[in-house]
Amino acid sequence: MVKISFQPAVAGIKADKADKAAASGPASASAPAAEILLTPAREERPPRHRSRKGGSVGGVCYLSMGMVVLLMGLVFASVYIYRYFFLAQLARDNFFHCGVLYEDSLSSQIRTRLELEEDVKIYLEENYERINVPVPQFGGGDPADIIHDFQRGLTAYHDISLDKCYVIELNTTIVLPPRNFWELLMNVKRGTYLPQTYIIQEEMVVTEHVRDKEALGSFIYHLCNGKDTYRLRRRSTRRRINKRGGKNCNAIRHFENTFVVETLICGVV
């Protein structure tokens, strides 16, 4: 704040004031000098403009957050579609209910045509096959669950009638690998290829009891756990079917190739 005072002029001004003072009397003698108080004007500052740099950085951050949210949404949507659509379709494509006609030269001298049905599950990533053979309509074999484990190189037969398991080395000359078997069944499903209708026979004999089932791998372990399990040794494989006669053998008919296989398990305990 600036204080400005006006003082009376020297000489003539003093004489005039003296005359006026004498005329006005003592009241005016005590009048103070005039003062004006001036408040200095505020210094005007130019308006500050916001930094464009800060604004651009904020915009980039918001854009990045939006992109992250969008990508997360796409990822979750992809996972949902994969789990509920692709995997479901893949499971359907890996499950087959199959039926094949074949000539049976064992039941009678006259060759008759029989139909063999089975349910097949092919696990491509785990590299194994699981086959369920229901009770045959016209005899000729026992119902069974079969696992071909290509990782362990083992085959396990669970004879449902006996409730016993039998394990043997995987015969890759008869059993198609999962990928090849899957392609075969897909072609059959489309009607572009039909398997041949002949049957071969393989004969096996029981050798020893298996105590450590965990050493057989998780797939066979889950199939045979809680059941008497035995090792098998392959005796012969032949195209011609021999009658079993008085042999102590159980038969399981199945197919995992372009032909039907009758597996004879002899020396059953």
UniProtKB/Swiss-Prot annotation:
Where on this protein are sugars attached?
A: N171
Q: Does the keyword Cell membrane apply?
A: yes
- The chain's disulfide connectivity reads C165-C224
* PROSITE patterns linked to this entry: BRICHOS
* BRICHOS domain ranges (all copies): 138-232
> Any keyword Transferase?
no
GO MF term (any one): ATP binding
Q: What is its main location?
A: membrane
Annotated TM spans = 57-77
**Family to which this protein belongs:** Belongs to the ITM2 family.
What is the name listed in the Swiss-Prot or TrEMBL entry for this protein?
Integral membrane protein 2C
Show the taxonomic lineage. Eukaryota, Metazoa, Chordata, Craniata, Vertebrata
Name of encoding gene = Itm2c
